[in-house]
Amino acid sequence: VKHVIIGTAGHVDHGKTLLIKALTGIDTDRLAEEKKRGITIELGFAHLDWPDGTQAGIVDVPGHERFIKNMLAGAGGVDLAMLIVAADEGFMPQTVEHLNILTLLGIRDGLIVITKKDMVDAEWLEMVQEEVRERAKGSFLEGKPILAVSAYTGDGIAELKQALYTLVHAAAEKSVRVPFRLPVDRVFSVDGFGTVVTGTLIEGCINEGDAAELVPSGSETRIRNLQVHGSTVHTAYAGQRVAVNLAGLKKTDVQRGDAVARPGSVRISRMLDVKLTNLRDSGRVITNDMQVHLYHGAAVMLAKVVLLDRDALEPGESAYAQLRMAEPIAAKNGDRFVIRFYSPLETIGGGVILDDAPVRHKRNVPAVIEALRIKEGGSAGDRVEQTLVELKTALPVAAQLAAKLGMEAEQLAAELGGLLGAGRIVEPLPGRYIASSALDEVAASCKTLLAGYHAKNPLHAGMKAAELRQKLFRAMEQTIADALLSELCREGVIRRAGERYALAEFEVRYTKRQNAIRDKLLKYYRGAGIEPITVEEVVASFPQNERADFKQVMDSVLSAGELVMLSPEICYHKEAYARACGAAKAHFAENETITLAQMRDSLGTSRKYALAILEYFDKTGITKKEGDFRRLNRGFPPAQA
C-alpha cells in the first residue's frame, strides 16, 4: 500500500479548509479562534479515501503570513502539493511565498486548484486560469493540471478527486527499510494515556512497543500506542500521518520541532553543510555571516550563514554554505530547509542538507567545495568514498556509514563491493572500511616516521610497535591501529620484525668490525644457554676500543629479537628464551600456577635465572604475580607458543 501526504498551500481565505471538507467531509479547523476568524492558524489534518481502498493524508496549512512557521511545520512531510488560488482574487503575496516554500522543500509534483468558481463569470475564470498558468512557469507546477471548483456547489470536486487519485498512484514509494523518523508538529495530553505527538512519518516504519529516542534532547521513550487517521494500528509506515502515545515523557518534555526516531539513528549537531538557494524574487542579497531564521521540519531556530566560496549570494543564485546554530538540531543528509530574513520575517531562500554533522570549515578552501560537490551530485559510490575520506582512520562499520549517508543497507553493500573491487577503498578488518586515499596518508606519515627512526638508529631492526602506534595514531583503539599497520605490511609499505616495524626496503648494515662483534656476541650467548654470565662481564670481555661499537651492536641484536634482555644483568639468546617459555608453558598445561621453585626445577637452573625469567614474564604481561606464585595473564605470544 502506498502512503502519500497531500499538502494545501495558498493565500489566506482562498478556501483551502472548505475545499478539504468538500473532498473529505472533514473540517480541519480545530481551534475556536479559527472558527471565529474563518482562517486556519494551526495545522489541520484529514484523509481522502477512494472506493478501491486508496487513501491519502491531507495537511491543511495556514495561509496568513503571520502563520508561515505553522505552514512550514506541516509542509515538511508533503509529497504532493495542492496550490489553492481563489477565482475572485488570483495570485496573492502568500500564494507566491507558499509556492516558493514548496519548491525549496523539494516537492516536485502536484496541481493547482482555482476555488470559488461560482463567484465569477466564465470570462473572468478564464483570465484567472491564464494568470495562474503564467505564474506557475519556472516552478514544479509548470504544466501541471489546473482545475476550477466550487466547494459550495460541489462543481469540479469529483474531477479534482480523480486527478488527485492519479497523482497519488504516480507518487514515488517512500523507504520503509531505514530507521524511522517522525518530526513532531503537535504535542498534547490525553487523559488516561499521557503525552501524544503527531507528525508525518517521513521515513521507516514504526511499531507499537518500539524503543524510541526524542531528538535533539536524547530522552528515551517507548511507543505505547499508534493511530493513523483516527484508527489504532500496530505499525505505521513512511508517508502516513501518525499520532504516537509516548511512554515515560511529560507534555513539557516534548516541543514542536523535536523528532521521534530510532535510538542512535539521528546525529545531533550545531552546524550543517548545505546547498543554499536565494529565491529569484527574494529582493535580498544573502551576505556572509548573515543571521537568519532556519526552518527544518517543524523546528525553528536562529542560524548564521557562512558562505564557503563567496561573500554574497544574489537573488536567483545558489552556493555552498555552512549554517551555524546556537542550539542543537536533529537533521539528516538530504533533508530540505527554508530560511527567512531575520527582520522583517520573509522567506528568502532554502535548500538541501549535504552534511548533517560537519566539522567547522574555513572559507574558500577548494577541497571543501569539491567534497560538497560530490555530496550534492556525485554517484552513490562517490558519496560513500567521500564519506570514508572524511572519516579518515575511524574504520566505520556498514551500519554507521548507512546512517551517515541515509542509504539503505542493500544499496550500501553493493556500493562497498564495487569500491573494494575498484581499489578505491580497503577493508583492514572484516566489515570495517577506509578510503584508499586515507590509507595512503597513513602510509606517508608512517614512512616519514620510520625513515627518521632508521636515520637515528641505523642498527635497530625497527621501531617498537607500541611506539609507532602512539606516534602515528595517538589514542586510537589498538585493534584498529594494528589492522592499519597490517594493511601497510600487506601493501609492501612496511614490514614487521618481531615486535618492531621497519620500512620494507630497510636493512641493517654493519661495518666489518660491528659484524665481527655481532658474530662473537651471538656465538657466546647461544653457547651459554640458560646460565650466561652477567651483561657487565660480557661487556668487559671486549677490548676498550670496541666498546662504543659493542653498545650499538647490542642494541641492534636486541631490537631484532636475536637476544632478549631479561634484566639489566641477564640476557638470553632467543633460543634459550624459547626453551624457558616452553618449560613454563608445559607446566601451565597441567597447573594453574607456578612458583619460583617450580620454574627453577623445570629448567634445571639456579634460583637467580628462574627469578629473572619469571619477572620478565610479569613485565611483559605473560604472567601475573599473586603472593608467592604466578598465574597466566595474557599468555605466551605465538612466537613462544
Locations of regions flagged by a protein language model:
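Residue-level signature of catalytic and energy-coupling elements of molecular machines
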Residues: 13, 19, 38, 60, ...
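C-terminal effector modules of nucleic-acid-centric enzymes and ribosome-associated factors
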Residues: 120-124, 134, 249-565, 573-622, ...
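Conserved catalytic-core segments of large NTP-driven translation/proteostasis enzymes
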Residues: 117, 123, 134-282
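Conserved G1/Walker A P-loop phosphate-binding module
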Residues: 1-61, 65
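Conserved Switch II/interswitch segment of TRAFAC-class P-loop GTPases
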Residues: 54-55, 61-66, 76-127
